Structures are given as C-alpha cells and as structure tokens.
Amino acid sequence: PAKLSQLRHDILTKFKHLPEMAEYLHRTIFEITKTYGKDTFLSVKYLGTKNIPRFFAIKSKVEFILKKIPLLSDSLPDRALFYLSKLFPQHLPKRILEFNHKYEHHLILKMSGEGVDEALEYLSKNWKNKCNGGFITCKFAEGNDALLHRFAAGVAAGRYQMIHNNKVEGILSLDIALRRNDNDWVENLPNEININLVKGLYYGHFMCNVFHQNYIFKKDTNIQKMKSIMLNMLDEKGAKYPAEHNVGHLYEAENNLQIFYKKLDPTNTFNPGIGKMNKYRNHCGCCL
C-alpha cells in the first residue's frame, strides 16, 4: 500500500503525462470476480458492447415473465448464466493470474503516447525486482482482459449474494472519497463488523482516491447497524460519501449541499426529502 501511495503521489506531481486509467483491485474482489463475474466478462467480450443492451433487454423480459409463474424465481436467468460460465475454460490470462497469486493489491495503469515510456522508466527504476512490489507490461489482449475484469467486479458482489442467499443477509455498498493527501486507504475494521462479515470487497479509482467498498454480511446481521458504524468511522476519518452518486434519500446532505438544494427548489416541490431534509412545503417544517 505504501508503494502504491508513493506511485500515486509521484504520478500526480512529477509525470508530464497522466494515466488514462488507474484502477485498483484488492485480491479478494479479484478472486470473487474471477468466479462470480465470469459470465459478465464472457458476455461483454464475445457479444460485444453494442449487443449488451439488447441482451439485457431480452433477459429483463424473461425475468418479468418468470415473476408471474408460481414456484419459479426471477433470478433463474442469472443463475443459469453463472452455472453456464463454469463450462468455459479459464478466461483470464496466465500472467495476470500469477500476479494475483503473488500480490494482494493490484493497480491497472493505462498510459498512452509518450506516457507509456515515462511510466516504464519510472516503474523499471522503482518497482522492478522489488520484494514488496512488481509490475508487468500487458500485451494488448491482456490489457483488455484486465480492464474487462475490473468492469465485471461491479456485478460480482450481487451475483455472490444471489448464489449464496441462504447464507447472506445482504450487501452494504459504499463509494467513498478519501482526502487527496490521505495515504491510509487500507481499511481496518472493528471486530463488531468483522464477526458479521462474509467478505469485504475493495476496488476503485486510485488516482482520485475514490473507492468502492462492498461488504457482504452473514445471515441475520443487522445491516443498518453495520452501516451506522461504518459511516461514523468514515466521518471520523474525514472521508466523503457518496463519492460518485447523489445523496438521494439514503444519506444526509451536508450543510452546503442543503443550502444549494433549498436555493434550487425553494418551495421544496420537486424532490422533497432529498438528503434526509424535511418534506414540508417551503422547507418551513411547520405546514404541508
């Protein structure tokens, strides 16, 4: 983690050419995605992105029909895709699998133009043959597969919950932004959370210090209580959440955001209750 933090600092302060992408994956989400994101990986790779919307439209229609049939689950298509993917051979390149076995933390760094040589020079000097870090230069196909694997990580947690719904209570998904100079990005959870946790999954946009954190909890866990503990921890750390999505009706809006919403909608007509604000007309809290 310390070397990756130094890498981020050096790229942002010293590089002339910034990365196109810098995607982080922890080993746990890598492994989960290898199994539970395989059908997503194969679908995108072999159907192509142009055909994916049509594929999901058909899948949605099938799920809609299944909801109307007694004793059949609307998750049947997803389950079928999951088990069908097991019939296919290993889909990830050998070198990437070896890298995952060797290291706990992974960064997919995509450079272009003169930035390629700049990154190679830096990595060769600071990362090559180091006992606590290393790198590989991906071939074109390997690079595409690595990024596609990162894409599939977004659905892997949900697929895990569906397959193991008898053991899983639910998933708490957080997207958080750490302070830009915060190098303490590896999370240490309290025992109160750990004893209820099946798996914690971490991935994100490393140069932005933005992380997606999915917590899969054991059956009968009070997820709202776990969420409250997690959010208090993030508040103490100075993190912001949600980082990439609006607060909606799930999170309390900060004071500046509340002021903005009140200015934008002074009569509280268009989305009353957003950011856990009151739902009264004109925000007065005294009349409907």
Task: Annotate each PLM feature.
Residues 1, 19-28, 32-33:
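FAD-binding core of FAD-dependent oxidoreductases
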Residues 1-13, 21, 287:
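FAD-binding subdomain of flavoenzyme oxidoreductases
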Residues 11, 15, 28-63, 69:
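Charged, amphipathic alpha-helical linkers/stalks
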Residues 27, 35, 39, 60-67, ...:
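Conserved glycine-rich FAD pyrophosphate-binding loop
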Residues 17-21, 239-240:
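Residue-level detector of anion-binding/catalytic polar loops
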Residues 79-82:
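Accessory "access/gating" subregions that flank catalytic or transport cores
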Residues 9-17, 232-236:
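Short, intrinsically disordered, mixed-charge
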